[in-house]
A protein has these predicted regions:
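A short beta-strand motif characteristic of beta-propeller blades
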Residues: 9-15, 51-57, 92-99, 141-147, ...
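Conserved beta-strand positions in repeat-built beta-propeller and related beta-rich domains
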Residues: 27-28, 33-38, 74-79, 119-127, ...
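Hydrophobic alpha-helical segments and helix pairs
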Residues: 90-147
Length: 296
């Protein structure tokens, strides 16, 4: 499992105190990093040249952001998918997501190669099997893809568009599905990675140009890179925060990995030991990402 393992320490990109910093994604048209603070109900745009963030506040939790155009993004609020105009802040509704009378909220999501938004959910308190995975089309149609999920997370697609990788956090496994890009149909194809004991649980995830999976591990203090064909752990990025929630490749060459973290669930003692929890980190791990898919 630990063949050729490389260990890397990241730099601090932007100091923040996000309760749960999540949903990191590099906007290919704006060359900036978008991310969210779920409980803070805030969308952020990190501008590397300025080393600062713009922000947009919402009236509900916000968990996912994906690019659409150079002036718009699509955001998952607690129970709704909306379009946000980044110039004037105006929003329009795209689709509603079932919330079981306020017991369920949106969690992680990304667009597939054909521009459909896949958005997963979780229950408040994370009751087992209460959540689902949905696919949202540009016309607002919502398809149910998976049910009996607990905490839907980490979804990416292979370069050849034949496989989708996904995790339900408490299972501590990354699942591979056969994927049909024209229809969006998926078929279970086995376990790609079993998360090693003592390294936390899989949260957000991104994929590099060689199809290796970079997985933010909640409670694992790092981002872990796996070969999805062998399950081998290749690289560990040791982050100075126990709860690592998401990661995304960015920068002009897509060779910088940005990492978001959380303060949620940490004791006062842990926050004293890890004061940068809730911040955004970055490093160049020797791999290149792939451009984010836009909603269309």
């Amino acid at each position: 499992m630990y063949k050729r393992q490389i260990i890397i320490s990241p730099d601090l990109a932007f100091r923040a105190e996000a309760t749960t910093g999540e949903g990191s994604i590099w906007h290919p048209d704006r060359n900036t990093l978008f991310w969210v603070d779920i409980e803070g109900k805030t969308l952020y745009e990190y501008i590397p040249d300025l080393q600062n963030c713009r922000s947009w506040q919402f009236d509900r939790m916000v968990s996912t952001v994906v690019p659409e155009t150079d002036s718009t993004v699509v955001v998952a609020l607690q129970n709704e998918i909306i379009r946000v105009n980044l110039t004037d802040g105006n929003t329009t509704s795209i689709a509603s997501i079932p919330d079981n009378n306020g017991k369920i909220r949106c969690n992680d999501g990304k667009c597939d190669p054909s521009g459909r938004l896949w958005i997963g959910t979780m229950g408040f308190g994370a009751p087992k099997g209460a959540a689902s995975l949905y696919c949202v089309w540009a016309d607002g149609t919502v398809e149910t893809k998976l049910t009996k999920v607990t905490i839907s997370n980490g979804i990416v697609w292979s370069a050849n568009k034949k496989y989708m990788y996904y995790n339900d956090t408490p299972t501590r496994k990354i699942i591979r599905f056969r994927y049909d890009d024209s229809s969006g149909d998926i078929l279970y194809d086995g376990v790609a990675v079993n998360i090693p004991e003592g390294t936390g649980s899989p949260d957000g995830m991104t994929i590099d140009c060689n199809d290796n999976l970079w997985v933010a591990q909640w409670g694992g203090g790092g981002v872990y890179c796996y070969n999805p064909y062998t399950g081998d752990l290749l690289t560990k990025i040791v982050v100075p925060a126990p709860h690592v929630a998401s990661c995304a490749f960015g920068g002009d060459k897509l060779d910088t990995l940005y990492i978001t973290t959380a303060r949620a669930g940490l004791s006062e003692e842990q926050l004293e030991e890890y004061p940068l929890s809730g911040s955004v980190f970055c490093c160049k791990p020797g791999a290149k990402g792939v451009p984010a898919n836009c909603f269309h």
